[in-house]
């Protein structure tokens, strides 16, 4: 008998259906030589400090730092019943093999391993690693089960991340709460993210707008604008020197080619859903996860934007169908070397036969965007003709740039998501030396623009790129930044939940509480560079290049140093 453990009931039932295990029991399904059960997210959590020593129930600076020799775990209260069911099933004599069917990623691996360890199970483990919940993908996955030990390094990385978060949260939060007599929460990823939001707010608050001027000339069907002029008297003199005509000094034409972007990873999907639909990062992740479990899209928690080369035939034949595509894009989109644990997010083949009206509108929007993005990624380039007309008066240049679309290329798939304003500006045919008759001239007063507050779109991009200036350019992009594609939405929501950040329409603003925290926290624990470096090291642990123990020792050393610094200053 084989026991299959999935991450959620809905996923377990989909797997059970494929395995023809149809006999429903309390907390599992049985049949055809399988028992299929499920976790309910994280059944096991790290214990709080008072589980190690009752004195830690009170927050005292004298007790810091807290570095357990062995970390304790406990079953969450809400999931005790399901854990008991899993423990009983795992230790039944009839079960000889456990199949880990939790989500194929770092957190999915951790969810299963912690249950397996807490249940004191010693049985053989196999790993189901799939990127789609389609029946065909599940069958294929079960025919190629991997040995569970292949993912030991992935679990070590998950453990290291959880322990690092615990160490920073339990020690640094207590340190500042004790020092300032206020309940502060410091997080390994959360606090550097908050620091970016606070810094942007500070830049906006202290921004001093600068006034400048331009002279605008309206001629036959278009207008020419001068360069920026800082002095109003100089701008007035220029306007007064302009007569009823102006001579064209230069006309340049060039063709601009824009290639399409690659299909979505989770971060780019979240960014575009925020930009186009106003969805939060968490909403997009929830909608995508639901679409995955309904077999409409492939695994969403991916950091890859390419597809594997063995997917070319099925994608071209079944998803692209009769739609025209650029064969020259094949090598860009289908590149196995650029795929990590999972390929880019695309629609499943079976979803193309489904009625989208059965989906909630929010999920249908996300699905259509994913489908259109895939079509666009394999589309032809956008080709535009750019014409720049320049005229001069008293050494000042006036110019206008026109744009005409020659071939719309991939943009035909993305028209629904673009601004409605005209993207073309057609200029009349003019040549160098031509005399243009002016209809009017106008002096315009303008101001330099302040930086914009972060939206979830721009914050996700900033989190993805944070700390990269400190990292060797040869390092893969997916190993940089604050958090991972799967965790960034939770970080943003947590900042809002804890009162450090608030939403103002699409903007994310730091609260007084958030600003106060960043004011007092040491640079090391609010630095994007530090956290990006730690994220790289976690990736190295997952690939077997770094040890969990060495990583955690370095973090303990940083915490010890900070605690002693404050203790000695009191």
What are these regions (language model features)?
Residues 232-264, 270:
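Metal- or metallocofactor-binding catalytic centers and their adjacent structured scaffolds
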Residues 1-162, 166, 450:
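Intrinsically disordered, low-complexity regulatory segments
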Residues 1, 101-104, 181-183, 253-262, ...:
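Conserved short loop/turn motifs at secondary-structure junctions
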Residues 9-16, 33-36, 40, 76-87, ...:
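Amphipathic alpha-helical transducer elements in NTP-driven molecular machines
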Residues 71, 84, 93, 135-219, ...:
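C-terminal or mid-to-C-terminal helical accessory/interaction module adjacent to the motor/catalytic core
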Residues 25-56, 191-234, 375-426, 554-564:
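Structured, non-catalytic alpha/beta "coupling" segments that mediate domain-domain communication
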Residues 2-3, 90-96, 118, 173, ...:
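Basic, low-complexity terminal or inter-domain segments flanking catalytic cores
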